[in-house]
């Protein structure tokens, strides 16, 4: 079975853990909020009774960023035709860490993900697309 999920809005990466004065680590509020949003979208699409995927999985993440308002007409065209790519934050590795948000819901553990592709590009509508399938299954 394949999973496909579209998350509206500019892509957000997982924030670094923060520490209290006593050394206790905690996840930043922005990250917790975004992970909860991803979970809610998944449950809305697939239902709360979804059986988590088993075995090795392949994951593709497409991050579409909004075109900056300051971009010239030519730059806008280059961005839409994938001749220019976003090289700003968030980093692709921090975007991929958001797979933690679907642990226990879409799959048992993100350790099952054995193949990962993350792509950043510009789009008229900012969003993130996540596609997951068992290894060997047709795309």
What are these regions (language model features)?
Residues 1-139:
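Acidic, proline/glycine-enriched N-terminal capping motif
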């Amino acid at each position: 079975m394949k999973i496909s999920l579209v998350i509206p809005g500019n892509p957000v990466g997982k924030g670094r853990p923060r520490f209290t004065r006593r050394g206790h680590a905690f996840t930043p509020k922005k990250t917790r909020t975004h992970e909860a949003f991803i979970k809610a979208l998944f449950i809305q699409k697939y239902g709360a009774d979804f059986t988590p995927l088993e075995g090795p999985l392949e994951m593709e993440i497409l991050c579409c960023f909004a075109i900056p308002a300051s971009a010239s007409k030519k730059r806008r065209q280059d961005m839409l035709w994938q001749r220019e790519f976003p090289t700003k934050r968030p980093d692709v590795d921090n975007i991929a860490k958001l797979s933690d948000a679907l642990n226990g819901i879409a799959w048992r553990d993100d350790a099952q993900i054995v193949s990962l592709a993350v792509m950043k590009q510009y789009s008229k509508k900012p969003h993130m697309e996540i596609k997951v399938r068992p290894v060997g299954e047709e795309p």
